[in-house]
UniProtKB/Swiss-Prot annotation:
InterPro entries: G6P_Isomerase (IPR001672), G6P_Isomerase_C (IPR023096), Phosphoglucose_isomerase_CS (IPR018189), SIS_dom_sf (IPR046348), SIS_PGI_1 (IPR035476), SIS_PGI_2 (IPR035482). Keywords: Cytoplasm, Gluconeogenesis, Glycolysis, Isomerase. This is Glucose-6-phosphate isomerase. It is found in: Cytoplasm. Belongs to the GPI family. The gene is pgi. The active site is at residues 350, 381, 503. Its EC number is 5.3.1.9.
Length: 540
């Protein structure tokens, strides 16, 4: 059966018409919000986190029908198939076993292989952190440069930044992803080659951006005095293609393995996270894995009605497919989580930005929403105006860390107050009558500008303290949310064919930029004109 023919879908359509104009402020009114309160009913713990879903435009019947939709769509079966190592990425004929990277059960798929590679990572990380692994002049490593793009960059960068407070102060970690040379050049201004270790991360070890930066970095080392036969002290590779790593010039002993059954955007738990392990240490890296495993167990064991990834995913579907929301916002009220929205952009949109169903037919309903965000309180002074008073409804995930990871007094209560106040203001709004009172006598014309529609839906995720364990759980929560939504939408969240066409055409255009002339028949007139302008500029 297709999604729209499922009984729960039909029931949700009828239910939506019944409650689409219901007001959250009415549901929270004292005469309606009796014990157990709405907040008590809709706040759910799991995996060391808690989620307050009460400020969403849902009632008990909404959740009942959404959970039935998950059952009808086969969420439980697909979840179990993924954990069992079955082929859940049919377009590439692969399993999706990122969960095996943090599993503690010896019977988990590839457990021995995963454990051996993690032990190799730990040995290397300890050597770098302790100073026993040195550069070619005998100086200890003080800078690590991670070169990768997409999942080989966004996840590690996000985690290293988030866990800065538990990282060693002896080593600075830098991330280079963009093929724009300015990205690498800016980092090279900050480092000494004698004290720098490069980690080159690419599943194929042929990725254009990564290999361009890797070659430039290798040339930089040599130009600044590092003998070519000493580069092994400064370069390691992470790849599913070891032969290509060795061909590049990295010693075979310096190659760490990743596997084709782990997608790039799910890979920070593997050797792709080597930069994380060097920064925070093997023991803390194990805690990161343990937190993800906590959420894995919750996802597998909790009933769907009390299952955080399931509910987060289903509520997202409620807004995307019934309310017609085009985007959703992630607002972590934590500067440590600065890069979480960027990480989730790839996780959500590269996974679920698809139009083809698993059977090859095309969907007739929206799939992935546009994912965006910025840490609070910065976002309040940029785009919250639109969230409060614009005509577009944007569902929001607020993320609040209850305990600060810094010693500065007076900051954290203000941060939390802003987070909670924003969710309340978005829910309550301000009526025209209330606005008239705020405007005051004689300022009737101002009142419409002081109104807030309210009824804007938000979820608040609560993290007691930002530790490797709670961060691991938070990341895994969103990973599993993506699977839930993909299953309901009947799409494959583990491939990314949408990035291929641009790559293919990019190689053609790159050749044309250095050619004597460009055949106008090769491209449309716009692209041809752009190439000609660029060719002229490159010759200056």
């Amino acid at each position: 059966m297709t999604l729209k023919s499922l009984p729960a879908w039909t029931a949700l359509q009828s239910h939506f018409e019944q409650i689409r104009h219901a007001r959250l402020r009415d549901w929270f009114a004292p005469e309606n919000d009796r014990a157990p309160t709405r907040a008590e009913r809709f706040t759910i713990p799991g995996g060391g986190l808690a989620a307050d879903f009460s400020k969403n435009r849902i009632d008990d019947e909404t959740l009942r029908l959404l959970v039935q939709l998950a059952r009808d769509a086969g969420v439980e079966a697909r979840r179990d198939a993924m954990f069992a190592g079955e082929i859940v990425n049919p377009t590439e004929g692969r399993a999706a076993l990122h969960t095996a990277l943090r599993a503690t059960d010896p019977q988990a798929p590839f457990h021995a292989q995963v454990s051996a590679e993690r032990a190799k990572m730990a040995t290397f990380a300890r050597a770098v952190r302790s100073g026993t692994w040195t550069g070619y002049t005998g100086k200890r490593i003080r800078h690590v440069i991670n070169i990768g793009i997409g999942g080989s960059d966004l996840g590690p960068k996000m985690v290293v930044h988030a866990l800065h407070h538990v990282a060693t102060p002896e080593i600075s970690t830098h991330f280079v992803s963009n093929v724009d040379g300015a990205d690498l050049a800016r980092v090279l201004e900050q480092v000494d080659p004698e004290e720098t270790l490069a980690i080159i991360v690419s599943k194929t070890f042929t990725t254009l951006e990564t290999m361009t930066n890797a070659r430039s970095l290798r040339d930089w080392f040599v130009a600044r005095g590092c003998p070519e036969d000493a580069l092994a002290k400064h370069f390691v590779g992470v790849s599913a293609n070891p032969a290509e790593v060795v061909k590049f010039g990295i010693a075979a002993d310096n190659v760490f393995e990743m596997w084709d059954w782990v997608g790039g955007r799910y890979s920070l738990w593997s050797a792709v996270g080597l930069s994380i392990m060097i920064a925070i240490g093997p023991e803390q890296f194990d805690e990161l894995l343990a937190g993800a495993n906590d959420m894995d167990r919750h996802f597998r064991e909790a009933p769907l009605e009390r299952n955080l990834p399931v509910l987060l995913g289903l509520i997202g579907i409620w807004y995307r497919n019934f309310f017609g929301s085009q985007s959703y916002l992630v607002a972590p009220y934590s500067e440590a989580l600065h890069y979480l929205p960027s990480y989730l952009q790839q996780l959500e949109m590269e996974s679920n930005g698809k139009s083809a169903r698993l059977d090859g037919t095309f969907v007739d309903y929206p799939t992935s929403a546009v994912t965006w965000g910025e840490p609070g309180t910065n976002g309040q002074h940029a785009f919250f105006q639109m969230l409060h008073q614009g005509p577009t409804i944007v569902p929001i995930d607020f993320i609040a860390v209850l305990t600060p990871e810094h010693p500065l007094a007076g900051h954290h209560p203000k941060l939390l107050a802003n987070c909670f106040a924003q969710s309340e203001a978005l829910m309550l709004g301000r009526t025209l009558e209330e606005a008239r009172k705020v405007a005051g006598p004689g300022k009737e014309a101002l009142a419409p500008h002081l109104t807030f529609p309210g009824n804007r839906p938000t979820t608040t995720l609560l993290v007691d303290a930002l530790t490797p364990r709670t961060l691991g759980a938070l990341i895994a929560l969103y990973e599993h949310k993506v699977l839930v939504q993909a299953t309901v939408w009947d799409i494959n969240p583990f491939d990314q064919w949408g990035v291929e066409l641009g790559k293919i055409l990019g190689k053609v255009v790159e050749g044309d930029l250095s050619a004597e002339s460009v055949d106008p028949a090769k491209h449309d007139s716009s692209t041809t004109a752009l190439i000609e302008r660029a060719r002229a500029a490159l010759k200056r």
